[in-house]
Amino acid sequence: MRHIVKERNLENKIQIFSKATSNYNIGNPPHSGTQKILTKYKIDFSNIYSEQLTKQDLTDCDYIIVMDDSNMNDVLKMNPSKKVYKLTDFIENCEHTYIPDPYYTRNFDLTYELVSKGCNSLLEHIIKEHNL
């Protein structure tokens, strides 16, 4: 999402934070399979490390975007809010109700495709919603 926001020259208007609901990989860079797909699409991940989601994040952010129902439940337990969405909510006519975790599926291409579509649609929503 950061690279899309940067391409659209909106980095001064939109901040992106990527946070984890579990503490399993805190401080680690993206999975090697994720690194390969990001490299394939020339997306810089050099400053991306897993960080823990906090209650303060839920207060500070305008949108909380999750990948699946498990993440949704974790976030809602921390702070029930109407600003929590699954990324697939923004993909028109999406067959998937969640973003499959490539750690388990090993299908990094499908996950990238869905995340890319979702991020582009989410950005269009934000631009329209906030008159950017």
Where are these regions (language model features)?
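Residue-level recognition of conserved beta-strand positions in structured domain cores
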Residues: 18, 67-68
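Conserved active-site segments centered on acidic
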Residues: 1-59, 124-132
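Phosphate-binding/catalytic loops
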Residues: 63, 69-132
